[in-house]
């Protein structure tokens, strides 16, 4: 992730990247509200909402407001992330070309009487594929002043937001079709990918910051080696904790073990009853929480020691 000598600081782009991070955090927060209020199926169709882009009275009914608002916000964020990627690559032509191809392919499929769901998935991935291909083909005629790392991460974030749109749509259509197990897996996957998307965008914003590009963050490799390794371990542990937590949340098993810190009503550390719900809860609220806490504290102490 090192900044290359050709990297240049652009204040407007750096500010925009930070704004996209904040917007992504806001969208994840809204998505969490959708789950908390069980509003995900308050709008049972997709990509439209009750057959419309702007259903009548959607603001007046709270669950519908949450779900439809989440969709509108997600669509806006998809556009923001796409613009960020094109800006990092310093080439707006792929954006225009991809838009034209996506519209043309969707229109062609519509003449064959494809369903709105098929049309939306086709539009998303024809746009993504064309955008990716155009970026690669035109990269020599429009060289970026930014490092390979930030270009790669911005492109990964673009693909991530396309994947999120697909997962969100499939989650609704699968549940509408009563494929409940598939819908549950998609809900968990959708929530976990959202956090990964946020991390990607935070990395992009960091790599575009003045401090990173100026190199004021740099330390010798010998000092960073142990910190880097422990940081990776902590990231993996936190993400596993996230996956288990999302699974518990979407299974509705947040109170599978209703006592804390004891996992046993009789006062023991281990749960008295063992099933998928209690075991997941114990792994998340006890083992995972302790492991992540120790790793993060160790990482902070190591960073402070190496920074002396």
Predicted features and spans:
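Interfacial helix-loop-helix junctions of multi-pass membrane proteins
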Residues: 34-43, 110-124, 166-187, 248-258
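Membrane-interface helix-loop-helix junctions at transmembrane boundaries of multi-pass membrane enzymes
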Residues: 88-97, 138-153, 300-308
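Extracytosolic (periplasmic/ER-lumenal) interhelical loops and adjacent juxtamembrane/interface segments
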Residues: 35-68, 254-277
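Membrane-interfacial catalytic/cofactor-binding modules of polytopic membrane enzymes
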Residues: 243-290, 296
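N-terminal signal-anchor transmembrane alpha helix
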Residues: 12-39, 236-248
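Individual transmembrane alpha-helix segments
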Residues: 59-80, 274-291
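Hydrophobic cores of alpha-helical transmembrane segments in multi-pass inner/ER membrane proteins
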Residues: 76-84, 124-137, 192-211, 290-297
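Membrane-interfacial, low-structure loops and terminal tails that flank and connect transmembrane helices
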Residues: 1-10, 138-148, 210-228
